[in-house]
Amino acid sequence: MDNWEEFCFGFTLIKAAGGLVFNHENELLMIFRNGKWDLPKGKLEKEESIEKCAIREVKEECGVDDLHIIKQLTDTYHTYELNDREILKHICWFKMKTAYNGKLVPQIKEGITKVNWVKRCEIAEKLENSYGNIIELLKDE
């Protein structure tokens, strides 16, 4: 057993996908959930491709349509506890573009209270109240 397998042994693995979505004005789609700025993402469903999962989650969490994947980005991992179980979430990220200019609709049942298009010059400010893996993901963008 290698170190990675040893590390993963005590966790329930959840695979998910999400998007760094940019509109025609090169603004980034961000969500506000649990008191932090984040990116739309969610769990992979059975027999769903990871790309379809990423697109579906952006649509569900933000109400954005007409999404096109540009490229796959780096994967991220984070751990948390849920119902006395240790969870390891593996997230596959995709850079996307959209021409959608309709209303943004936060998925309230998922705890999302805001969905915003964020100008490039305002991203750093939002990242002051975000997660380490999101900061790392956006470093090269």
Language-model features: where?
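Short connector loops at helix/strand junctions that flank enzyme active sites
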Residues: 12-17, 32-34, 89-91
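Unchanged
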Residues: 44-131
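Charged phosphate-binding loop/patch that engages nucleotide di/tri-phosphates or the phosphate backbone
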Residues: 129-141
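Acidic, metal-coordinating catalytic segment for phosphate/diphosphate chemistry
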Residues: 1-18
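Compact nucleic-acid interaction/catalytic patches
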Residues: 40
